[in-house]
Protein backbone atom coordinates (compact mmCIF):
# COMPACT_ATOMS: atom_id res chain seq x y z
CA UNK A 1 0.00 0.00 0.00
CA UNK A 2 2.98 2.30 0.24
CA UNK A 3 2.24 3.36 3.82
CA UNK A 4 5.49 4.25 5.56
CA UNK A 5 4.13 5.75 8.76
CA UNK A 6 0.96 5.59 10.80
CA UNK A 7 -0.06 8.87 12.40
CA UNK A 8 -2.04 7.32 15.26
CA UNK A 9 -2.63 3.69 16.18
CA UNK A 10 -5.81 3.14 18.19
CA UNK A 11 -6.86 0.00 20.02
CA UNK A 12 -9.26 -0.99 22.75
CA UNK A 13 -9.16 -4.14 24.86
CA UNK A 14 -7.30 -6.82 22.85
CA UNK A 15 -6.85 -4.22 20.08
CA UNK A 16 -4.78 -2.36 22.67
CA UNK A 17 -2.65 -5.48 23.07
CA UNK A 18 -1.92 -5.34 19.35
CA UNK A 19 -1.06 -1.63 19.45
CA UNK A 20 1.37 -2.19 22.34
CA UNK A 21 3.10 -5.02 20.49
CA UNK A 22 3.28 -2.98 17.31
CA UNK A 23 4.78 -0.01 19.17
CA UNK A 24 7.49 -2.30 20.48
CA UNK A 25 8.13 -4.28 17.29
CA UNK A 26 8.03 -1.34 14.85
CA UNK A 27 8.87 1.76 16.91
CA UNK A 28 9.48 3.94 13.86
CA UNK A 29 6.23 3.03 12.11
CA UNK A 30 3.81 4.77 14.50
CA UNK A 31 3.92 8.41 15.59
CA UNK A 32 1.19 8.38 18.29
CA UNK A 33 -1.16 5.94 19.96
CA UNK A 34 -4.38 5.77 21.91
CA UNK A 35 -5.11 2.63 23.91
CA UNK A 36 -8.33 2.06 25.84
CA UNK A 37 -9.36 -0.45 28.52
CA UNK A 38 -6.28 -2.56 27.92
CA UNK A 39 -3.22 -3.80 29.78
CA UNK A 40 0.41 -4.74 29.19
CA UNK A 41 -0.24 -8.31 30.34
CA UNK A 42 -3.36 -10.45 30.64
CA UNK A 43 -4.37 -10.33 34.29
CA UNK A 44 -5.01 -13.35 36.49
CA UNK A 45 -8.62 -12.14 36.59
CA UNK A 46 -8.84 -12.06 32.78
CA UNK A 47 -7.35 -15.55 32.54
CA UNK A 48 -9.91 -16.80 35.09
CA UNK A 49 -12.77 -15.29 33.06
CA UNK A 50 -11.41 -16.87 29.88
CA UNK A 51 -11.07 -20.22 31.64
CA UNK A 52 -14.76 -20.06 32.59
CA UNK A 53 -15.57 -19.28 28.93
CA UNK A 54 -13.62 -22.31 27.73
CA UNK A 55 -15.12 -24.56 30.40
CA UNK A 56 -18.63 -23.59 29.25
CA UNK A 57 -17.69 -24.57 25.70
CA UNK A 58 -16.01 -27.82 26.83
CA UNK A 59 -19.14 -28.80 28.79
CA UNK A 60 -21.26 -28.66 25.63
CA UNK A 61 -21.74 -32.38 24.74
CA UNK A 62 -21.23 -31.57 21.05
CA UNK A 63 -17.80 -29.98 21.62
CA UNK A 64 -15.05 -31.69 19.61
CA UNK A 65 -17.57 -33.71 17.58
CA UNK A 66 -17.16 -33.61 13.84
CA UNK A 67 -20.25 -31.50 13.21
CA UNK A 68 -20.62 -27.97 11.90
CA UNK A 69 -21.91 -26.30 15.06
CA UNK A 70 -19.95 -28.31 17.65
CA UNK A 71 -19.86 -26.43 20.94
CA UNK A 72 -22.33 -23.76 19.81
CA UNK A 73 -24.54 -23.87 22.92
CA UNK A 74 -21.45 -23.88 25.12
CA UNK A 75 -20.21 -20.76 23.35
CA UNK A 76 -23.56 -19.08 23.94
CA UNK A 77 -23.14 -19.86 27.64
CA UNK A 78 -19.58 -18.54 27.52
CA UNK A 79 -20.84 -15.27 26.10
CA UNK A 80 -23.41 -15.04 28.88
CA UNK A 81 -20.62 -15.49 31.43
CA UNK A 82 -18.66 -12.76 29.67
CA UNK A 83 -21.55 -10.31 29.85
CA UNK A 84 -21.40 -10.55 33.65
CA UNK A 85 -17.87 -9.10 33.47
CA UNK A 86 -18.29 -6.74 30.52
CA UNK A 87 -21.14 -4.99 32.34
CA UNK A 88 -21.84 -4.54 36.06
CA UNK A 89 -24.50 -4.62 38.77
CA UNK A 90 -25.63 -1.03 38.26
CA UNK A 91 -26.15 -1.28 34.50
CA UNK A 92 -28.13 -4.52 34.87
CA UNK A 93 -30.20 -2.84 37.58
CA UNK A 94 -30.95 0.14 35.33
CA UNK A 95 -31.80 -1.80 32.18
CA UNK A 96 -32.88 -5.31 33.20
CA UNK A 97 -34.61 -4.73 36.53
CA UNK A 98 -38.15 -6.08 36.83
CA UNK A 99 -41.02 -3.76 37.81
CA UNK A 100 -43.46 -6.61 38.37
CA UNK A 101 -43.07 -7.94 41.92
CA UNK A 102 -45.10 -11.05 41.05
CA UNK A 103 -42.89 -12.20 38.18
CA UNK A 104 -41.25 -15.62 38.67
CA UNK A 105 -39.93 -16.39 35.16
CA UNK A 106 -39.05 -14.83 31.81
CA UNK A 107 -36.83 -12.21 33.42
CA UNK A 108 -35.33 -9.36 31.38
CA UNK A 109 -31.79 -10.35 32.43
CA UNK A 110 -32.35 -13.89 31.18
CA UNK A 111 -33.71 -12.65 27.87
CA UNK A 112 -30.82 -10.20 27.47
CA UNK A 113 -28.14 -12.82 28.09
CA UNK A 114 -29.78 -15.33 25.76
CA UNK A 115 -30.03 -12.66 23.05
CA UNK A 116 -26.33 -11.83 23.45
CA UNK A 117 -25.40 -15.52 23.17
CA UNK A 118 -27.45 -15.89 19.98
CA UNK A 119 -25.98 -12.71 18.54
CA UNK A 120 -22.42 -13.95 19.09
CA UNK A 121 -23.29 -17.33 17.54
CA UNK A 122 -24.08 -15.52 14.27
CA UNK A 123 -20.58 -14.03 13.99
CA UNK A 124 -18.23 -16.44 15.78
CA UNK A 125 -17.58 -20.15 15.64
CA UNK A 126 -16.99 -21.93 18.96
CA UNK A 127 -13.46 -22.99 17.96
CA UNK A 128 -12.46 -19.44 17.02
CA UNK A 129 -13.92 -18.07 20.28
CA UNK A 130 -12.14 -20.79 22.26
CA UNK A 131 -8.81 -20.12 20.54
CA UNK A 132 -9.21 -16.35 20.92
CA UNK A 133 -9.46 -16.73 24.70
CA UNK A 134 -6.35 -18.93 24.71
CA UNK A 135 -4.41 -16.33 22.73
CA UNK A 136 -5.60 -13.50 24.99
CA UNK A 137 -4.25 -15.42 28.00
CA UNK A 138 -0.74 -15.33 26.53
CA UNK A 139 -0.56 -11.53 26.22
CA UNK A 140 2.52 -10.21 28.02
CA UNK A 141 4.63 -7.46 26.43
CA UNK A 142 7.62 -8.27 28.67
CA UNK A 143 7.91 -11.85 27.36
CA UNK A 144 11.21 -12.18 25.55
CA UNK A 145 12.12 -8.58 26.37
CA UNK A 146 12.46 -7.71 30.06
CA UNK A 147 12.06 -9.08 33.58
CA UNK A 148 9.70 -6.26 34.55
CA UNK A 149 6.75 -5.00 32.52
CA UNK A 150 7.46 -1.43 33.60
CA UNK A 151 10.85 -1.69 31.84
CA UNK A 152 9.14 -2.83 28.65
CA UNK A 153 6.68 0.06 28.88
CA UNK A 154 9.61 2.49 29.17
CA UNK A 155 10.79 1.36 25.74
CA UNK A 156 7.68 2.91 24.15
CA UNK A 157 8.74 6.46 23.37
CA UNK A 158 5.88 7.64 21.15
CA UNK A 159 3.33 10.12 22.46
CA UNK A 160 0.22 8.38 23.67
CA UNK A 161 -3.09 8.49 25.42
CA UNK A 162 -4.14 5.74 27.83
CA UNK A 163 -7.87 5.62 28.55
CA UNK A 164 -9.87 3.84 31.28
CA UNK A 165 -13.57 3.35 31.82
CA UNK A 166 -14.51 3.86 35.46
CA UNK A 167 -16.83 0.83 35.69
CA UNK A 168 -14.71 -1.68 33.75
CA UNK A 169 -14.55 -4.91 35.76
CA UNK A 170 -12.61 -6.94 33.18
CA UNK A 171 -9.73 -4.50 32.72
CA UNK A 172 -10.11 -1.98 35.54
CA UNK A 173 -8.58 1.52 35.61
CA UNK A 174 -5.70 0.35 37.81
CA UNK A 175 -4.32 -1.49 34.75
CA UNK A 176 -4.27 1.65 32.62
CA UNK A 177 -3.02 3.84 35.48
CA UNK A 178 -0.04 1.50 35.88
CA UNK A 179 0.75 1.82 32.18
CA UNK A 180 0.38 5.60 32.17
CA UNK A 181 2.86 5.86 35.06
CA UNK A 182 5.50 3.88 33.17
CA UNK A 183 4.96 4.99 29.57
CA UNK A 184 7.36 7.95 29.20
CA UNK A 185 5.21 10.12 26.94
CA UNK A 186 1.68 9.09 27.82
CA UNK A 187 -1.26 11.01 29.16
CA UNK A 188 -4.06 9.35 31.09
CA UNK A 189 -7.80 9.85 30.72
CA UNK A 190 -10.77 8.37 32.55
CA UNK A 191 -14.22 8.01 31.00
CA UNK A 192 -16.89 7.98 33.68
CA UNK A 193 -19.39 5.46 32.35
CA UNK A 194 -21.65 2.77 33.77
CA UNK A 195 -21.30 0.57 30.69
CA UNK A 196 -18.16 -1.31 31.72
CA UNK A 197 -15.89 -3.02 29.23
Indicate where each model-derived feature is located:
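Conserved hydrolase catalytic core segment
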Residues: 5-46
Amino acid sequence: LGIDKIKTAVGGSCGGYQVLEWLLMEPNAIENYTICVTSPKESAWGIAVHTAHRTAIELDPTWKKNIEDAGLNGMKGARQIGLLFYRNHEIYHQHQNEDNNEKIKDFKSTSYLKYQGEKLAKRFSPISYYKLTEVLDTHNIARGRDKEIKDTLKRIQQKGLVVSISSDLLCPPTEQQFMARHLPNAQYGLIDSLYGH
